């Protein structure tokens, strides 16, 4: 069956269609070819894609309008009552998200572990098909790793009405997957966030899966992880961490727009790192290494922004930021804790467990293709199974949507148990 829908029209239904929502795209038509069962191919006859359409840069006003309050649901005591990683603390059904009627949402708070080994509470949301029976074995799971949002509690995607990527994630729910979207520790919950730290975020992703299964028993045991930007680094870090865990249910990782380390991501942010991003980076380093002295990195002028970082999200920005050049002290990158932080976030040092699909756009200013190639070369050299899909003339905002067909095909192949394809040099 093929639907032709004018772009800008939201389709909401609890009927038979596996697509209950389509993203708001500008111009042209969206043609969705659907087959009975799991298989679906999406053909987009427009140049604008999911990432651009659903997360426009509308500034502080837009972020405020989409924000949800931080409720007592997210509050946890310090220290936490003892719990194993992945153990569910609490859950609640939540109906205030801007999601299609075909999607049910359940918020979760669960035990995870910080970089220092501390038991930390982490929040997230589980999205499942509404009113449908799961297949035998339960809903196949896509663990979603989100991109950079900031370090404030309010920057948690589960505290945004569109869950950060609502139309994109809803598409997968309507294809028959459950989506488990962690916030990362410290976003939502009252702990420090390890900004841009792949190993910490990967731990939160891995622990979100059993917690989600405890909250929503219809979830199956098999899962993949997919992430974009900071979440791409996280998805690859999950693959590396799984080398030591070897969860038989884990089937692979998709890294979109960021198959590289924290140092390269911050250095190659569009038009250079923003002042707030540098403040957030210092915050993340301090979270991973508590003995790190922020004043060894940041100037006196930057400290006010650093202390305000817990109140500001990257999207909303700050009214009076010092320039990036005024933020940092000369030679800050040679600080021992900064170097250790960047080194622990350098991909391709630990062999990945399971296949990786890397997706990037050659026009990506934030994640330079040559740096991605260097990371993939390291990973391939150590025997990782990497499939790299490059899209000419696409930037991060469009590559996440324009690569949907490849994403779906790769995910279907993993759950079907078909062999992986690699194109390592």
Predicted regions and their residues:
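Primarily recognizes the serine-hydrolase "nucleophile elbow" in alpha/beta-hydrolase
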Residues: 211-216, 220-275
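C-terminal catalytic histidine-bearing segment of alpha/beta-hydrolase fold enzymes
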Residues: 340, 366, 373-425
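Catalytic-loop region of hydrolases
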Residues: 51-133
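Short beta-strand/loop motif that positions the catalytic acidic residue
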Residues: 358-360, 364
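Accessory cap/linker subdomain of secreted extracellular hydrolases
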Residues: 58-71, 78, 256-349
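Short beta-strand element of the alpha/beta-hydrolase
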Residues: 137-147
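Conserved alpha/beta-hydrolase
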Residues: 146, 169-188
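Alpha/beta-hydrolase active-site loop
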Residues: 195-215
């Amino acid at each position: 069956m093929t639907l032709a829908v004018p772009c800008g029209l939201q389709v909401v239904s609890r009927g038979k269609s596996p697509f209950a929502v389509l993203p708001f795209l500008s111009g042209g038509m969206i043609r969705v070819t659907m087959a009975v069962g799991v298989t679906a191919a999406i053909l987009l006859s427009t140049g604008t894609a999911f990432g651009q359409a659903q997360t426009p840069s509308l500034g502080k006003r837009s972020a405020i309008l989409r924000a949800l309050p931080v409720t007592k649901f997210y509050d946890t005591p310090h220290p936490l009552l003892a719990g194993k990683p992945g153990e569910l603390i609490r859950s609640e059904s939540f109906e205030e998200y801007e999601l299609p009627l075909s999607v049910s949402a359940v918020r979760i708070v669960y035990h995870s572990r910080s970089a220092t080994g501390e038991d930390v509470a982490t929040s997230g949301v589980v999205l499942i098909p509404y009113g449908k029976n799961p297949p035998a074995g339960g809903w196949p799971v896509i663990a979603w790793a989100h991109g950079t949002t900031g370090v404030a509690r309010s920057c948690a995607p589960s505290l945004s009405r569109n869950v950060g990527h609502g139309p994109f994630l809803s598409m997968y729910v309507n294809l028959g997957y459950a989506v488990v979207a962690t916030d990362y520790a410290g976003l939502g919950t009252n702990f420090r966030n390890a900004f841009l730290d792949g190993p910490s975020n990967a731990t939160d992703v891995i622990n979100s899966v059993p917690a989600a299964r405890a909250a929503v028993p219809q979830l199956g045991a098999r899962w993949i992880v997919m992430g974009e930007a900071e979440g791409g680094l996280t998805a690859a870090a999950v693959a590396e961490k799984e080398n030591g865990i070897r969860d038989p249910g884990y089937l692979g990782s998709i890294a979109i727009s960021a198959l590289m380390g924290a140092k390269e991501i911050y250095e190659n942010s569009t038009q250079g790192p923003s002042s707030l991003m540098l403040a957030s980076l210092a915050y993340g380093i301090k979270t991973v290494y508590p003995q790190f002295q922020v004043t060894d990195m940041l100037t006196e002028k930057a400290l006010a922004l650093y202390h305000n970082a817990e109140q500001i999200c990257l999207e909303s920005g700050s009214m009076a930021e010092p320039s990036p050049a005024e933020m940092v002290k000369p030679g800050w990158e040679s600080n021992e804790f900064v170097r250790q932080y960047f080194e622990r976030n350098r991909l391709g040092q630990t062999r990945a467990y399971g296949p990786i699909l890397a997706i990037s756009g050659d026009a990506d200013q934030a994640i330079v293709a040559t740096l991605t190639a260097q990371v993939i070369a390291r990973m391939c050299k150590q025997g990782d199974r990497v499939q790299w899909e490059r899209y000419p003339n696409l930037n991060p905002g469009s590559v996440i949507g324009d690569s949907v067909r490849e994403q779906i095909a790769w995910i279907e192949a993993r759950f079907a148990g078909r062999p992986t394809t690699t194109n390592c040099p």
